[in-house]
């Protein structure tokens, strides 16, 4: 095994992304999930900016401040830093994340993540979104490896299925407490133990 490829939401950070709708509905309780999701998904695929999301939803005033107040509610997953420090000098590391360009940049700078990763594939930058297999294949190509050399960690079964389809070794980080028939862990301590036991990472 030569590389570890990680999802962002629900893996590197605690929040799975499912908190955005209720966060918005605190201010706009009458907005439907669909009305919130439509601009959000457009930003994730790079069709609009993240600031356009807040404006479309109905927020007014200093949109950058409003956005940063939301992003500052997001926290790193427990044990992530310890995990990444253990593997950073032994294996290539990559992120594949469905996110707007601005949100991803803000969070990566906030948590000083860029220094850890050889490849960072963000849907808003690439205009490719999981579960489109092209974002996986592009990441593998940028790593300069074969798919079978890569472990992929995500909290969503659909993304893991695509990773497996292209030849990566999928692992569920079960931050959302879902049922999954494949290889799964509950935290980064378990992930370290699993990759050592099953994939030979030491």
Model-predicted segments: where are they?
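Short alpha-helical
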Residues: 19, 75, 102, 157-158
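Active-site neighborhood of HAD-like aspartate-dependent phosphohydrolases
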Residues: 1-38, 56-61, 165-166, 180
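Short, acidic loop-to-helix structural element flanking the phosphoryl-transfer center
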Residues: 51, 65-94, 105, 133
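Short hydrophobic segments within beta-strands
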Residues: 7-8, 96, 153
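Asp-based, Mg2+/Mn2+-dependent phosphohydrolase catalytic module
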Residues: 2, 100, 108-202
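A metal-dependent, Asp-based hydrolase signature
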Residues: 40-67
């Amino acid at each position: 095994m030569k590389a570890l490829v990680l999802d962002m939401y629900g893996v590197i950070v605690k929040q799975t992304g499912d908190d955005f709708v209720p966060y918005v509905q605190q201010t706009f309780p009458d907005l439907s999930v669909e009305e919130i999701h439509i601009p959000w998904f457009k930003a994730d695929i790079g069709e609009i900016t993240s600031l356009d999301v807040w404006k479309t939803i109905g927020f007014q005033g200093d949109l950058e401040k409003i956005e940063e107040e939301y992003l500052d509610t997001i926290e790193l997953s427990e044990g992530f830093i310890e995990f990444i420090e253990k593997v950073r000098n032994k294996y290539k590391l990559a992120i594949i994340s469905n996110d707007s360009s601005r949100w991803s940049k803000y969070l990566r700078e906030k948590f000083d993540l860029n220094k850890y990763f050889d490849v960072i594939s963000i849907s808003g930058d690439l205009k490719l979104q999981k579960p489109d297999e092209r974002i996986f294949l592009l990441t593998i190509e940028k790593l300069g490896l074969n798919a079978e050399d890569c472990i992929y960690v995500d909290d969503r079964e659909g993304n893991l299925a695509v990773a497996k389809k292209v030849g990566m070794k999928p692992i569920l980080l079960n931050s959302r407490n879902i049922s999954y028939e494949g290889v799964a862990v509950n935290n980064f301590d378990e992930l370290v133990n699993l990759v050592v036991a099953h994939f030979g990472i030491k």
